[in-house]
Swiss-Prot record:
Signal peptide (residue range): none
EC number: 3.-.-.-
Domain of life per record: Bacteria
Protein name: Uncharacterized hydrolase SH1513
Entry annotated with the keyword Hydrolase: yes
Species lineage: Bacteria, Bacillati, Bacillota, Bacilli, Bacillales
Organism of this sequence: Staphylococcus haemolyticus (strain JCSC1435)
Length: 383
């Protein structure tokens, strides 16, 4: 079986059988069966996912990570390998990440059998990237306590970069993701007796207006930030004063100071709305993933590997504004570096973005990823 046949077979199987975060049971079974057939030892620190290891009898241990979960999206691709699970789809390319790491494991096992594996390698098949913080769960579970990992590498498909390109950036490459929720409680009344009620409808309109101005008036316009209002509602009937109101959204920033500014302004909004409209207004925050920070000291190894794999380095001037739980590896485990491999191919129609119902790509890019990983492994530690 050629490598293209290998990645096509495994990626399309995974694509047909997507599973949501923390429910990747069949995906895990598929991966571990592959590892067993290959003769590679692994551990299962969590209910789903797996950590595999090959000992190269080296002083250096490096890790490579792939996320394995899917999204609650109905697939609209008209292909024979479309999702067989209703309203679940690999719309973020994790089927590709998993397959590329499987190919890399296969290559490393061949080197191991020949006695030419240059370093000790940890392969992370991580669950729950989309929701659940699988990276953090693995770290907290002690999954890596027995491995003196010096560096962690990961990659993500990117439909906005062309095939053969690898997008990199030192320091921040993805943003933090923090969810916020406003809860409003007033007093209902008939619309004919409106003065007897405390309307959360008007109060919520004020909240929406004020939250919408945070980004414009309180954050540096030269930085990339998002204060997004995703869902809001108030009231239950057309002829009653709304007794409850609700707003939820997300904050994306790569500067902790900017995040604090947003939180402070939202608390002020809640306080002012309570006073102005005589309702109870409270805002709560749910911390998501911190910014992904790429270690500058790994930059030389990354750039050398990209070039050695005959791929093109694309420097990104500003971070992406989506969240990524790969950030926990760099924050808690070891210096880390996260890159993006281009999958855009206009001739084949592979142009739609991540988290869309038409995401697709040519499996040959997964070989590019394995090539990049192999070059990182071969040249890691060189000056």
């Amino acid at each position: 079986m050629s490598e293209l046949e290998f990645v096509t077979k495994h990626r399309r199987h995974l694509h047909q059988h997507p599973e949501l975060s923390l429910h990747e049971f069949e995906t895990t079974k598929y991966i571990t069966q592959f590892l067993e057939e290959l003769g590679v030892s692994y551990e299962r620190p969590l209910e789903t996912g797996a950590i595999a290891y090959l000992n190269g009898n080296s002083d250096h241990t490096i890790a490579f990570r792939a996320d394995i979960d899917a999204l609650p999206i109905f697939e609209e691709n008209d292909v024979d390998y479309r999702s067989q699970t209703d309203n679940v789809m690999h719309a973020c390319g994790h089927d590709g990440h998993t397959t590329a790491l499987m190919l890399f494991v296969k290559r490393c096992k061949e080197m191991f059998d020949k006695g030419t594996l240059p370093h000790n390698v940890v392969f992370i098949f991580q669950p729950a990237e989309e929701t659940g913080g699988g990276a953090n769960r693995l770290i907290k579970a002690g999954a890596f306590n027995n491995y003196p990992i010096e560096a962690v590498f990961g990659i993500h498909v990117n439909p906005f970069a062309d095939e053969g390109q690898v997008v990199i950036r030192d320091e921040e490459i993805t943003a933090s993701a923090t969810e916020y929720r406003f809860f409003l409680k007033g007093l209902s009344s008939h619309v004919a007796d409106k003065e007897q009620g405390h309307s959360c409808g008007e109060a919520l309109l004020h909240v929406l207006n004020q939250v919408g101005q945070i980004q414009q008036y309180h954050l540096n316009g030269l930085k990339r930030n998002i204060v997004h209002m995703g869902h809001f509602e108030a009231g239950e009937a057309i002829n009653t004063v709304a007794s409850h109101g609700y707003l939820e959204g997300t904050i994306r920033t790569y500067d902790p100071n900017d995040l604090n500014v947003v939180k402070t302004q939202m608390h002020k909004i809640a306080e002012s709305v309570s006073l102005l409209f005589n309702v109870d207004c409270e805002v709560k925050f749910e911390e998501g993933y911190p910014p992904t920070m790429n270690s500058p000291k790994l930059r030389a190894s990354v750039e050398q590997a990209i070039n050695a794999a005959n791929l093109e380095v694309i420097d990104k001037p500003l971070p992406f504004l989506f969240g990524e739980d790969f950030s926990f590896y760099g924050q808690q485990l070891a210096p880390a570096y996260f890159a993006f491999v281009g999958t855009r191919n206009e001739d084949k129609g592979f142009v739609t973005g991540l988290h869309t119902s038409h995401l697709n790509f040519d499996e040959k890019v997964l070989i590019y990823v394995a090539n990049y990983y192999e070059q990182l492994l071969m040249h890691y530690g060189e000056e």
